[in-house]
């Protein structure tokens, strides 16, 4: 692994079942994550995934690439455009720093509406 290496692209289909089940699994009962009618009444296009799901997807993207021995040390993300039901969330990543056993990965998750999440993940990998 070298600085500048790209991670393989990963796509997540945000089906309504995915949006609702991940919100409930993270105990996020806000109606905008499971009730389409109320989400639309509140000005949203549809239900959308929550921040805990987004954070988990970012971590999974990096650790699936790095392998089971990778240890996540830091996650710093910024949310952008919502990821609505029926969107495809496409993840891209690049190694931006390597130091002994530590890697810093820049991650972007994008839908047709723009960047849903941008961030940095720092991991420790065995030598």
Where are these regions (language model features)?
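Short, charged/polar low-complexity linear motifs in solvent-exposed/disordered segments
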Residues: 26-27, 38-39, 74, 91, ...
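Hydrophobic residues in beta-strands and at strand termini
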Residues: 14, 79, 123-125
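Mid-chain, well-packed structural core segment of small domains
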Residues: 62-91
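HotDog/MaoC-like acyl-thioester-processing domains
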Residues: 1-7, 83-127
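Hot-dog-fold acyl-thioester-processing enzymes
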Residues: 1-71
């Amino acid at each position: 692994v070298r600085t500048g290496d790209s991670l393989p692209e990963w796509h997540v289909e945000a089906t309504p079942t995915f949006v609702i089940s991940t919100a409930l699994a993270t105990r996020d009962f806000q109606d905008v994550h499971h009730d389409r009618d109320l989400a639309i009444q509140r000005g949203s296009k549809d239900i959308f995934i929550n921040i805990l799901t987004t954070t988990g997807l970012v971590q999974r993207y990096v650790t699936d690439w790095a392998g089971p021995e990778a240890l996540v040390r830091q996650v710093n993300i910024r949310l952008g455009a919502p990821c609505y039901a029926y969107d495809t969330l496409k993840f891209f990543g690049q190694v931006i720093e390597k130091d002994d056993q530590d890697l810093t990965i820049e991650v972007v998750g994008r839908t047709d509406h723009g960047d849903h999440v941008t961030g940095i993940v720092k991991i420790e990998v065995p030598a």
